[in-house]
Amino acid sequence: MIKLIATDIDGTLLKDGSLLIDPEYMSVIDRLIDKGIIFVVCSGRQFSSEFKLFAPIKHKLLYITDGGTVVRTPKEILKTYPMDEDIWKGMCRMVRDELPACDYFAATPDFCFAEDGGSPVFHLLRDSYGFEMREVDDITRLDRNDIIKFTVFHPDKCEELCTPVFIPAWNKKAHLAAAGKEWVDCNAKGVSKWTALSYLIDRFDLLPDEVCCFGDNLNDIEMLQNAGISYAVSNARQEVIAAEIGRAHV
């Protein structure tokens, strides 16, 4: 019996980078919650973005944000998985030196840091995704222990640009996953959306077989592989469809 449903957002429920969602989803989710199902929004988005997107039912949901690095209720943070400072600062320096066509940002549980308030990534995150943004002169000069995600950005081919140098340099020191054509997300090693879901499974004394997940991209693979029932949407990457062998595709 399914007791918890977790879904990705961008590419799964709506078009990437939108704050417009079909209102019918709200009705369906609300009915599921009324039947006792725990419903979890599980995305690479920031909490403020997820909270705005699901406004009509926002107080009834649980939230996994920033690619699995933050677990929270509408009112409080339950768990975070911060990155080692040397890792995210090293990533930042490498993007500057080796990937001049790319931009980047660093996320805390509540807002993101970027170095140019006029840059495309700053405006995209703030205006299209509804993120809380902070402009700083130099991310590597930040003295913080709450950076939970570092993300590389390119508008068309981020994964392609990161593959020759960046990904090989860091994929044994951190968890890296493409999240659409624009993003490569970097979490602490071993931390994915499934890590956060596992925390909730333990918290509510559930079994993986009592969990149902929906997703479309590489950062969804772990949760799709481990949930009792998983669904890849029709536009999912082929790697994602292949990963959830023997399960339904919608």
What is the meaning of each model-derived region?
Residues M94, A101-F214, L218-N226, N235:
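Conserved acidic, metal-coordinating active-site core of Asp-based
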Residues L20-F122:
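Active-site phosphate-binding/coordination module
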Residues G36-V40, H59-L61, I148-K149, D209-E210, ...:
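Short active-site oxyanion
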Residues M1-T7, D30, D34:
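Non-catalytic pre-domain segments flanking phosphatase-related domains
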Residues G11, L32, G67, F150, ...:
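Residue-level signal for inorganic ion chemistry
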Residues A248-V250:
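Conserved small/polar residues in nucleotide/adenosyl-binding loops
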Residues I9, R45, G215-N217:
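Active-site metal-binding loops of divalent metal-dependent hydrolases
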Residues K3-S18, L224:
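Asp-based phosphoryl-transfer active-site loop
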